[in-house]
Regions:
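Basic, often amphipathic N-terminal segments
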Residues: 1-71, 93-150, 168-177
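Short, basic/glycine-rich phosphate-binding loops at helix/coil junctions
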Residues: 78-89
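Short, exposed beta-strand-loop hairpins at the edges of beta-sheets
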Residues: 159-163
Length: 177
């Protein structure tokens, strides 16, 4: 059986912005905070191919993709249709298309059949998980009222899997295109 692997991109941001995101995650998503640092998930829980094939594919996509500048200015409610829980996301307006295109490029070739077509992709950094959607909505509304501004860039993608409650890296690939 193939391992369950993810591809993420860690944002490069001002240290104060990363500290703010980390503080929000520690307060509102302790499980995610302990698992992995702030990130955009690009490939979700994939076990469609062996690790060597997966890594080679991600390396090839990264080699032809340029670094992606982004700017998150919106805290968005992410409701879970299968649970009363809900999430708070930081969503980029600048960089949205480029991150989405990177996601789409990763789900080609050997990963093409692994893409979930029933869930639209929204690039985001999860900053909270709440017991109810109204709680998440209230948190997002407060952030948006105060003003959200997190500029940065994505310069690499990381492949990894969850091992003993931690995201263990299997490879890092710079965006070189």
């Amino acid at each position: 059986m193939n391992p369950t692997i993810y591809t993420v991109a860690y944002p490069e941001c001002d240290a104060r912005d990363l500290q703010t995101i980390d503080t929000w995650r520690a307060a509102n998503d302790s499980t995610g905070h302990a698992l992995v640092r702030p990130h955009f998930t690009l490939v979700f829980a994939c076990n469609a191919v062996d690790e060597a094939t997966y890594l080679a594919h991600v390396a090839a996509v990264a080699a032809r993709t340029a670094p992606i500048p982004f700017h998150c200015r919106y805290a968005m409610l992410g409701a879970d249709a299968h649970s009363p829980r809900a999430h708070a996301y930081l969503v980029p307006d600048e960089g949205y298309a480029a991150l989405s295109l990177l996601h789409d490029a990763l789900y080609t070739g050997p990963l093409a059949d692994a893409m979930r077509l029933d869930l639209p992709y929204t690039p985001h950094i999860t900053v909270g998980t709440f017991e109810t959607a109204p709680q998440a909505r209230k948190w997002c509304a407060a952030r948006n009222h105060a003003g959200v501004s997190v500029p940065g860039r994505v310069a690499a993608v990381w492949v990894g899997q969850v091992v003993d409650g931690q995201f263990e890296h299997r490879g890092q690939f710079g965006l070189m295109g």
